[in-house]
Amino acid sequence: MSVGCACPGCSSKSFKLYSPKEPPNGNAFPPFHPGTMLDRDVGPTPMYPPTYLEPGIGRHTPYGNQTDYRIFELNKRLQNWTEECDNLWWDAFTTEFFEDDAMLTITFCLEDGPKRYTIGRTLIPRYFRSIFEGGATELYYVLKHPKEAFHSNFVSLDCDQGSMVTQHGKPMFTQVCVEGRLYLEFMFDDMMRIKTWHFSIRQHRELIPRSILAMHAQDPQMLDQLSKNITRCGLSNSTLNYLRLCVILEPMQELMSRHKTYSLSPRDCLKTCLFQKWQRMVAPPAEPTRQQPSKRRKRKMSGGSTMSSGGGNTNNSNSKKKSPASTFALSSQVPDVMVVGEPTLMGGEFGDEDERLITRLENTQFDAANGIDDEDSFNNSPALGANSPWNSKPPSSQESKSENPTSQASQ
């Protein structure tokens, strides 16, 4: 089955690609007779042409995109439906084409306003089953000019001219074409299962053969019955009732799963779920991670300073012992003071007495300009000891001149 387009330069390849009777590469399927259903559990599946199975025999190009092929396989599996198909058959169908966390969304507009129904993986099998329970004997999807896009971990298929076609045999033969936008997300792996299914219905048409109208042309009552739609927005009453029921069933999936897993009573399951939901609502938001202050590089001391520090180790012992007391006094006066103690790195052994205390002030409330003119606090600083190099004044020019002759005489 192929439908051509009269427009110049227009190709009907995309329509042929999704024809339910033809595989994606255009080779015809074995003849399909309406009224005879194929079941994979009842009879053997018809053989495909060699070009459809083995890439090396008679096939020069791949059979099209993987998403196209998955839609064709979904239509083929739906054609195998029979009235004997039970819940296990529908669950296997859903497992084959839908992910474990898949979501199916249907949007349409009725007389009382727009509707939107979203169901999870557990309720998807019953949705497809409700279509056949509503009187449909055949179901397939036709996508025209779809757009495929690759993402990080999934492939999206967006078709603005998608159609869901169902055929009904009761009360009389009717073909229902539901037109809308179909958006699918396939996981980008070997199985290519659907993660997101969103079908936005715009309009629908119900087609009746002219032969039936000719048979009842003289019966006004029958013509009035034929003029009435058998669906609402392309969906049967069975499907609409199930979608309304899913509004209650979908939130209860967590309760049902907990009841099946832990064998709790419905009341206990409800209490547990409500308590966990309350904990998620009350839990404080995670605090943003604070940036750690960059560590300051330690300056290496020159050799002369090392010798002087080594030579004056005994003389400076008193100042080292005095520094902790003055440091703690300073920290007690100024609020928000951090005192950092580090062992000495130059000579000596690590111990209580031989230890260097480094004081670092970090106080946002402290104004550095106030201490510039305070000479008393500078003179009383613990760093200014008796033998501190900061107290020694540089020699004057006269003293340096008097020292030079003595040094020359000694030479």
UniProtKB/Swiss-Prot annotation:
Compartmental location: Nucleus
Positions bearing Phosphoserine: 265, 302
N-acetylserine: residues bearing it: 2
Changes after translation: Ubiquitinated by RLIM/RNF12, leading to its degradation by the proteasome.
Pfam families tied to this protein: LID, LIM_bind
Keyword Nucleus in annotation: yes
Residue positions where Phosphothreonine is found in the record: 61
Compositionally biased region (Low complexity): 302-318
Gene Ontology biological process: anterior/posterior axis specification; cell adhesion; cellular component assembly; cerebellar Purkinje cell differentiation; epithelial structure maintenance; gastrulation with mouth forming second; hair follicle development; negative regulation of DNA-templated transcription
Gene Ontology CC annotations of this record: beta-catenin-TCF complex; cell leading edge; chromatin; nucleoplasm; nucleus; protein-containing complex; transcription regulator complex
Keywords: Acetylation, Developmental protein, Nucleus, Phosphoprotein, Ubl conjugation
Domain LIM interaction domain (LID) residue range list: 336-375
Stated consequence of mutating residue 299 to Q: In a colorectal cancer sample; somatic mutation
TM stretches of this protein: none
Region described as Disordered: 283-330, 367-411
Domain of life of the organism encoding this protein: Eukaryota
Record remark: domains: The dimerization domain is located in the N-terminus.
Quaternary structure annotation from Swiss-Prot or TrEMBL: Interacts with ESR1. Forms homodimers and heterodimers. Interacts with and activates LHX1/LIM1. Interacts with the LIM domains of ISL1 and LMO2. Can assemble in a complex with LMO2 and TAL1/SCL but does not interact with TAL1/SCL directly. Strongly interacts with the LIM2 domain of LMX1A and more weakly with the LIM1 domain. Homodimerization is not required for, and does not effect, LMX1A-binding. Component of a nuclear TAL-1 complex composed at least of CBFA2T3, LDB1, TAL1 and TCF3. Interacts with LHX6 and LHX9.
UniProt-recorded name of the protein: LIM domain-binding protein 1
Organism for this UniProt entry: Homo sapiens (Human)
Organism classification: Eukaryota, Metazoa, Chordata, Craniata, Vertebrata
